[in-house]
């Protein structure tokens, strides 16, 4: 993992972004690409996306720009690109619909917007598959259908339990 600008004892409280809206990938917990040229390109692309869509929500591997009907997940590191590829191609009635979107050479995913449920969840109130999603990252799409919205690392569990 690359070194970050984040102080060693920074209280994250569930956030992975040290400086909200920063375009420096080292200000994100796991930010930065191994290839330095891609890292610089990602930072400038992130700046353009922030100017266009506003401050993103930060995850471990991606910055998520939230629109009215869709979200765009931009990778903050190499793992973020892998996650985007998985979420763009995996199809299930239990997961948010997405499609691959390449922005300035980076694999992103454009995904239907999900109204996120507050965590912690009372898992007993939801279908069994919800237990397979890390941190219960679920919500309802615009049609009122329950879906997982951050599931790239849980795909193997979802396919086994079909």
Mark where each language-model region is:
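Juxta-kinase regulatory segment immediately upstream of eukaryotic protein kinase catalytic domains
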Residues: 2-53
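Short hydrophobic-acidic sequence motifs that mark active-site Asp/Glu residues
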Residues: 64, 71-73, 110, 139, ...
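Conserved structural core of kinase catalytic domains
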Residues: 75-76, 87-125
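Catalytic activation segment of kinase domains across protein kinase-like and atypical kinase folds
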Residues: 131-162
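ATP-binding glycine-rich loop module of kinase domains
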Residues: 51-90
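Generic beta-strand structural signal
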Residues: 66, 102-103, 140
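Short, surface-exposed coil-to-beta transition loops
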Residues: 59-60, 104, 133-136
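Short secondary-structure junctions
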Residues: 47-57, 97-100
């Amino acid at each position: 993992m690359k070194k970050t600008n984040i102080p060693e004892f920074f209280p994250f409280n569930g956030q992975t972004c040290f400086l909200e809206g920063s375009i420096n990938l080292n200000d994100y917990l796991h930010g930065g690409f191994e290839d330095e040229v891609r890292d610089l390109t990602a930072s400038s692309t992130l700046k353009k996306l922030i100017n266009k869509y506003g401050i993103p929500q930060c995850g471990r591997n991606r910055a998520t720009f939230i629109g009215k009907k869709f979200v765009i997940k931009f990778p903050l590191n190499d793992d973020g690109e892998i996650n985007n590829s998985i979420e763009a191609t995996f199809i299930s009635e239990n997961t948010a619909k997405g499609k691959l979107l390449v922005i300035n050479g980076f694999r992103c995913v454009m995904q239907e917007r999900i109204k996120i449920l507050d965590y912690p969840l009372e898992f007993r109130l939801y279908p069994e598959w919800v237990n397979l999603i890390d941190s219960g990252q679920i919500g309802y799409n615009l049609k009122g259908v329950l879906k997982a919205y951050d599931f790239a690392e849980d795909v193997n569990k979802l396919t086994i339990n079909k």
